[in-house]
Structure formats: C-alpha cells, structure tokens
C-alpha cells in the first residue's frame, strides 16, 4: 500500500505573458511604413483537476514546484505571439486548496472533473501597433509580458466516504472494514495500528452499497492535535454517517461510557463540530470473554443519561451482528442523502480564484541610503516590469506615468534630489526633477 499523504505544501508559478514587439513595416511599395509590432501571447495558467482515480497527494510529495510555460513574444507584421498551454495538475477528489501564507480558502474540489485555476498566466504585452498617435506615428514603445501569478499553496485531502469508523485505537475498526469490504488494512492488537485512513466499498446482498473509511484511532485531545487525531478528524467532515465503535474488551482497563464520551467530545471540539453527524453506536469485540457484562453496564450508563439510541453488539471475528449493522447503516446513509437532496448544492465545473490586488496607486517610498531610495508597491512594480526599457520612447512613457501616479512628488517629500538612485522592483533609475 502506498504511503498516504493527506496534506502538503507546493509552489505554483503561472507563465509570463510574451513581450510585445517593436517593429515597422518595410515593404517595397510602402514608404515610411507605420508600426507593425504584434502582441505577445498569454502565459499558461495552472489548473487543478479533480481525478476520482487518485487516492492520495503522493504525487506532490517529491515534486513541490510547478511552472507553466511562458507566452511567445509578438512578431513583425503585426503577428501575435502564441499563447502558452495551461498546465493541468490532477488532484484527488476531496482536495481543499488554501493560500499557505494567509490561510485563505481558495477552492474545494468535490466532484470528478471539477477544475480550479490556482495561478493565472500573465497577459501578453502590447506591441507598438497600439501606441501610434497623431503626434507620434512611429512609436518605439512596447510592453513586456505580464508576470504570471506566483503562489504558495497548502493542499488538504479529506476523504469522500459515506461512512466513517471512529473510536479509540484498537477497538476493531480495521477488522470491521476488512470483513465487510475488500479493503486490506493492517491489523494487529496494539495502539495506533492504523496510521493511514483506509477506504472500502460495502456491497449488500440487496444491491445497496456505500463507501466506508477506517480512520486512525482518536485519543483525548485529538481535536487540539494530540496524537494522530487532528490529522484525521478532517476526513470525518465529509462523511454522511459515523459508526462509533466502543470496545467491550473487559481487559483494556477503560470504562466504555468514558470512552464514548471522550470521542464525542473530540468530535464536538473540532473546528467544524462533527458531533451533529448521524451516528450509530457499535459495541465491538463481543467475542472476548466478559464482553457481555461490560455491554450491559454500558447500556445501563447510557440509559441513565437518557440516551435511548440503540447499541449494535458485534464481533468482526465471528461476524455476529455485522449483517444487521451494515443494513441499518445503508438505510441511514439513504436517509441522509435524501435530506441533502432537499438542499441542492450547485458545483461550478471550473472556478478561477481571484486574488485580491492592492489599489493601483498604493505605494510607499523608503530612504535606504544618503542618495538611495526604494519605491515599493505591487502594481507599481508590475508597471515597471512590463515596460520595455530598451527604447527611449518606452522610458519616457514610464516617466510620465510615474509622475501622474505621484511617485515624483513622494520622492521629493522624502528628500530626493537630482542624481539620486531610485529602485523600483529589480530596476534602478536616476532621479531627475
């Protein structure tokens, strides 16, 4: 069985747009031809696609950085550069995507084939055909391609199982899964045997079926991260029904009612309160001598608390009570599904996450040396980055735009004089009043 990976961190870099072209028409019968530089192509975006054939995030364990292709540069004769192909990355159904730095939820891939654009490719820069005016009929101005979005993401996988098996370690969850499905979990009589979730399909004689997940054992404090718990409580979020297994082994040194309440408290304390999910109480390991006496006490304790929910007594070793439990579980799953149908949820096939951009005029000036200044601002840095500085026309256009945005005034307020160095992003300019 492959290692189960249900949380990982990756970096995604969308492609840069192609640069616009500075070119002019040079044809035999067209003297003094005008501008003919084409636009650059758009950069490739990075798109997640939900794939029902994947079960883990293992593909991202050894490769953490993904980069889409850049767009082609514009060409002569007003020809556009070719746009880059988008990079599609397959993720398991049930993957939730967060911005690693802010913790913001970007998207939730819950349907097969659902897509999520997590990094958008930059637009292509405009060629000089766009900058001709009555004053400047032959502009040597073109834009560089826009940089693609660069993000650090946190991916979480939450299993999409109809039924989740919860309980203390070694209460028989893996054994129950193995005798009711074709899943082959590791089984042994010691704590934390199950270190990874196992998923199987229960198929009943009447044709009904449901998926069931054996989740690693919980202990007190799991919702706060004690033991393995919080890593796996997230998988319970998507289940329709919980089978809460309580061991009737009289030799484990624990009271059944205390075990039951401990797990219930952990479910309730989790961030999204899992205690409201439909639950069947299962008294497991009834084949062990003395289990009947412990079961009687457990039922008596529940009655004292006015808990009249039925308790299913089973033995996965002898299969006693398992058939009825599975039939009643299937019925409960159907009931929950009918309740959910009454509140239909529309799932977008393709979603593009819109990252929040700062205000266009938002920038700050910092004096870092006697004659050195740094201007910081994401939109401003992008403007400089997209300006083709190989031509004087482009430099003058940038200077005019910076002045209109108030950069010159802000520099003077900080004490900048002629000849001082001004850094914007990766570029350094000489300040001229």
Curated annotation (Swiss-Prot):
Binding site for Mg(2+): 174, 194
InterPro entries: G_OBG, GTP-bd, GTP-bd_Obg/CgtA, GTP-bd_prot_GTP1/OBG_C_sf, GTP1-OBG_CS, GTP1_OBG_dom, GTP1_OBG_dom_sf, OBG_GTPase
CC annotations in GO: cytoplasm
Annotated localization: Cytoplasm
Keyword vocabulary terms for this entry: Cytoplasm, GTP-binding, Hydrolase, Magnesium, Metal-binding, Nucleotide-binding
Any one GO molecular-function label of the UniProt entry: GTP binding
Annotated residues for binding of GTP: 167-174, 192-196, 214-217, 284-287, 315-317
Highest taxon, organism lineage: Bacteria
Subunit structure, interactors included: Monomer.
Function, in words: An essential GTPase which binds GTP, GDP and possibly (p)ppGpp with moderate affinity, with high nucleotide exchange rates and a fairly low GTP hydrolysis rate. Plays a role in control of the cell cycle, stress response, ribosome biogenesis and in those bacteria that undergo differentiation, in morphogenesis control.
Similarity field: Belongs to the TRAFAC class OBG-HflX-like GTPase superfamily. OBG GTPase family.
The name this protein goes by in its record: GTPase Obg
Species, as recorded: Lactobacillus acidophilus (strain ATCC 700396 / NCK56 / N2 / NCFM)
Designated gene of the protein: obg
